[in-house]
Amino acid sequence: MVKLQYLLSILLYAYSCTALMLDRRDPTPGQLSQVTDFGDNPTNVGFYIYVPQNLASNPAIIVAIHYCTGTAQAYYSGTPYAQYAETYGFIVIYPESPYSGTCWDVSSQSTLTHNGGGNSNSIANMVDWTINQYNADASRVYVTGTSSGAMMTNVMAATYPNLFAAGIAYAGVPAGCFYSEANVEDQWNSTCAQGQSISTPEHWAQIAQAMYSGYEGSRPKMQIYHGSADATLYPQNYYETCKQWAGVFGYNYDSPQEVQNDTPVAGWAKTIWGENLQGILADGVGHNIQIQGEEDLKWFGFTS
């Protein structure tokens, strides 16, 4: 009887070790994989990662953030970043919202504060884990997203400017525009969404800079896309977002360096304020603005 109990204890120990190893198995190259143990995850954000089979030494990282109703899988399947990863050897992080409806929390004080314990904090910890796990190049970390993911892109650029070299926001709003005075997570803000939150570049810049109080280091260069016929996040949000980053970088919002018509698509207009800020307004395009993958690669420095 004692011998049987001893054998059972060995088997149970072996089973528990195997289960632990399976739970912590490394991501499979060439497949979207979930990471469940990456350190502090205060808001239970899902962490999915694509590690290419053709992984570069000291790889770059792109954080690709999905829209409302989206998932990591949907953004992986519907965007070109994983395909590009096989060519350029970078890693793609696909966070997944923990909320019903899968919008991102861009409203609470915690997510709008550096190391505040919100969604932004969880995503930043994914970046740190990936840098350490794969010896990634910390100077080549980029962030992009669509709709709610674009809102979070602007928030990440404001709360963790030390982490990112560049950002691209497709159809978002300025960082802090959805702020909830009641400190409610994942709260919709109709005033902002409908383009009624209008302010100066200086004020928008103050809002972004307050998210990492005292920070004086470099900030990610930003590229802002929006459709002129967006009826979900009204196009005024394009202008307000460009105001925000113009204010952050010290550009004169009213005097851009250059406007390029029919760029990168016929009917679209690219406004350049300086090397750190570009805005692209897509004439007649609604909320479902198409990702410009080749242009993204240029902005992130993979191509010229």
Curated annotation (Swiss-Prot):
Task: Kindly provide the name given to this protein in its UniProt entry.
Answer: Acetylxylan esterase A
Give the temperature dependence: Optimum temperature is 49 degrees Celsius.
Q: Which reaction does it catalyse?
A: Deacetylation of xylans and xylo-oligosaccharides
User: What EC number(s) are associated with this protein in UniProt?
Assistant: 3.1.1.72
List the GO biological process terms. Answer: cellulose catabolic process; xylan catabolic process
InterPro entries annotated for this entry? AB_hydrolase_fold (IPR029058), Esterase_phb (IPR010126), Plant_Biomass_Hydrol_Est (IPR050955)
Question: In which pathway is this protein known to take part?
Answer: Glycan degradation; xylan degradation
NCBIfam families assigned: esterase_phb
Listed under GO cellular component are: extracellular region
Identify one Pfam family in the record: Esterase_PHB
Q: What is its main location?
A: secreted
Cellular location of this protein?
Secreted
Glycosylation site residues: N189
Organism of origin: Emericella nidulans (strain FGSC A4 / ATCC 38163 / CBS 112.46 / NRRL 194 / M139) (Aspergillus nidulans)
Keyword annotations: Carbohydrate metabolism, Cellulose degradation, Glycoprotein, Hydrolase, Polysaccharide degradation, Secreted, Serine esterase, Signal
What GO molecular-function term can you cite, just one? acetylxylan esterase activity
Is the keyword Hydrolase assigned to this protein? yes
The protein's pH behavior is summarized as: Optimum pH is 7.5.
In the record, which residues are listed under signal peptide?
A: 1-19
SUPFAM superfamilies assigned: alpha/beta-Hydrolases
Similarity comment: Belongs to the carbohydrate esterase 1 (CE1) family. AxeA subfamily.
Binding partners and assembly: Monomer.
Q: According to its UniProt record, which residues of this chain constitute the active site?
A: S147 (charge relay system)
What is the stated purpose of this protein?
Acetylxylan esterase involved in the hydrolysis of xylan, a major structural heterogeneous polysaccharide found in plant biomass representing the second most abundant polysaccharide in the biosphere, after cellulose. Degrades acetylated xylans by cleaving acetyl side groups from the hetero-xylan backbone.
